[in-house]
């Protein structure tokens, strides 16, 4: 997982991944230096967008008004690069990590970075991990589908095969870069598992293009620069809520990507981190997950009809099954093959 990264790239990532919450702005270097000495603080690194993480943090702060929350959001690849830079400096700043690149969590577990913690109410949760041991817990069952611009695509695609063959999608279907986006990486791994690498090649041959990130590819579809894309549920839902001419279509082979949350073993604010993970699994927080447009991990959540999301049990049952340990072993190869194909 943690590859050797050029110093310049690490510095860039450190600058890019900035504070988005807590005090409402970037944190100074002095504040960062005091991180370990501040008992009433919590630092979260996440790939979740503000439309999802923002409401959850506000709910947590309402129940824990004495805790200052500094949440920092970026793509999974940038987060892992930042963590590697911090490891090289001798101190991880984050208490919690919450992304969708499942293999990273297996690698961090293998390297002894994660604290085992089973959140309160675990028996009420849907667990997608057969080898669960408390090192990380799914906080949502993210789904991806074919997002179409309804002004460009007159009829819904009937299958994954449609976007690899239909001229309507030629040179106008976008995929986020799996080197940057955890959900994109997992989606490519799932599609390869279900249909073989030949399917990815045929997507390329029909003119599919690589975009920078999971948000950008949905933006480009909403703006009409693309006719369609491989899109994340809640990012698409947020655009639809703002009036974008988009629709999410789910083929029967469902792309379900769990989003694990974990505590770092050397976290400076471990008690606060446990409180946050406990809150994240509550009915209140999981209802916020659903209202943001993605699939919660609790069965007792009322799903918003406007997003056409699968029920949590259905997402777990119908998602393409994959061995995450095997995906970890093949991660570099998958990213390299994709990058060589989609230059």
State each model region's role.
Residues 21-24:
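Bacterial signal peptide processing site
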Residues 103-107, 227-245:
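A ligand-binding cleft/hinge motif common to bilobed small-molecule-binding domains
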Residues 128, 142, 201-203, 210-211, ...:
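Periplasmic-binding protein-like
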Residues 264-321:
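Mature extracytoplasmic/periplasmic domains
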């Amino acid at each position: 997982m943690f590859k050797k990264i050029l110093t310049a790239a690490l510095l860039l990532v450190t600058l890019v991944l900035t504070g988005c919450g807590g005090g409402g702005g970037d944190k100074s270097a002095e504040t960062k230096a005091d991180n370990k000495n501040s008992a009433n603080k919590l630092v979260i690194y996440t790939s979740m967008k503000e439309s999802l993480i923002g409401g959850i943090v506000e709910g947590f702060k309402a129940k824990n008004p004495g805790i200052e929350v500094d949440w920092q959001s970026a793509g999974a690849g940038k987060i892992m690069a930042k963590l590697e830079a911090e490891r090289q400096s001798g101190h991880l700043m984050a208490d919690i990590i919450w992304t969708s690149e499942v293999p990273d969590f297996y690698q961090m577990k293998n390297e002894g970075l994660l604290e085992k913690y089973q959140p309160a109410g675990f028996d009420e949760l849907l667990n997608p991990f057969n080898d669960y041991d408390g090192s990380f817990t799914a906080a949502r069952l993210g789904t991806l589908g074919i997002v179409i611009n309804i002004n460009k695509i007159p009829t819904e695609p009937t299958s994954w095969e449609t976007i690899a063959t239909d001229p309507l999608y030629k040179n106008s279907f976008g995929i986020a870069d799996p080197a940057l986006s955890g959900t994109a990486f997992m989606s490519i791994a799932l599609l390869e598992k279900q249909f073989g690498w030949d399917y990815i090649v045929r997507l390329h041959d029909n003119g599919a293009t690589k975009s920078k990130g999971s948000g950008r590819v949905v933006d480009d579809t909403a703006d009409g620069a693309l006719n369609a894309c491989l899109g994340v549920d809640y990012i698409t839902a947020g655009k639809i809520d703002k009036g974008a001419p988009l629709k999410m279509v789910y083929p029967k082979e469902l792309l379900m990507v769990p989003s694990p949350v974990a505590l770092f073993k050397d976290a400076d604010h471990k008690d606060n981190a446990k409180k946050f993970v406990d809150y994240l699994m509550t009915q209140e927080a999981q209802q916020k997950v659903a209202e943001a447009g993605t699939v919660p991990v609790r069965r007792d959540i009322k799903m918003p009809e406007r997003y056409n999301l699968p029920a949590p049990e259905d997402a777990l049952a119908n998602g393409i099954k994959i061995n995450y340990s095997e995906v970890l072993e093949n991660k570099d190869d998958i990213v390299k093959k994709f990058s060589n194909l989609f230059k």
